[in-house]
Amino acid sequence: MTARGRFITLEGVDGAGKSTHAAWLADALRDMGRTVVATREPGGTPLGETLRGLVLSESMTLDTETLLMFAARCEHLTQVIEPALARGDWVVCDRYTDATYAYQGGGRQLGADRIAVLEQWMRPALQPDRTWLFDVPLELARARLADARLPDRFEREEAAFFERTRAAYLARAQAHPGRIRIVDSSRPVTEVRAQLHAELQALAEMP
């Protein structure tokens, strides 16, 4: 019987630097001999990418936004994540359900209980084996975004939105200390990757 793969997620506010490290993490796992599926949310499937485009660019109600996030996630789980884990592959995903609790729950102030209903309806048992939360002072995150591409609908939000989002992320980390590890991504890239590599090796050696 094929051993189940491992599910890794990367989280953080826009500008925290998580996407910078996602491809590196996947390559590090491949160097350890693991087969890796690198993916992202919202997205990861043709339908998911279409929904991503809508969510990031079109004006909509908060309920619609949240439901579209979970619609994309349901397709992603069914078509990509669950089959990969069943094959014994490792999945590295740029954002997952923690992002919904942070952005819609914290940033947009939707009640966490409403998000929990959708999470329980979908796949309550499937949680990441490890989540790295890339945390950075918001001034630095916004400075990084200023040098990036044309900002999307979320990246154009006011500072208070990101303060609430960051606070919600840190609350998630406090509530799930066994799964979520905080990474101070204001440090140099070499220091961040040294931490990630050490923790990744420990995870890879776990039975």
From Swiss-Prot:
Cellular component per GO, a single term: cytosol
Entries under InterPro entries matching the protein: P-loop_NTPase (IPR027417), Thymidylate_kin-like_dom (IPR039430), Thymidylate_kinase (IPR018094)
CDD domains per the UniProt record, alphabetical: TMPK (cd01672)
Gene label: tmk
EC number(s) recorded for this UniProt protein: 2.7.4.9
Alphabetized GO MF terms: ATP binding; dTMP kinase activity
Family named by the database record: Belongs to the thymidylate kinase family.
Organism: Bordetella petrii (strain ATCC BAA-461 / DSM 12804 / CCUG 43448)
NCBIfam families given in the database record: DTMP_kinase
Keywords from the named record: ATP-binding, Kinase, Nucleotide biosynthesis, Nucleotide-binding, Transferase
Source taxon at top rank: Bacteria
The name this protein goes by in its record: Thymidylate kinase
Binding sites annotated in the UniProt record for ATP: 12-19
One Pfam family this sequence matches: Thymidylate_kin
Function as written in the Swiss-Prot or TrEMBL entry: Phosphorylation of dTMP to form dTDP in both de novo and salvage pathways of dTTP synthesis.
Catalytic activity from the UniProt record: dTMP + ATP = dTDP + ADP
GO BP terms, alphabetized: dTDP biosynthetic process; dTTP biosynthetic process; dUDP biosynthetic process
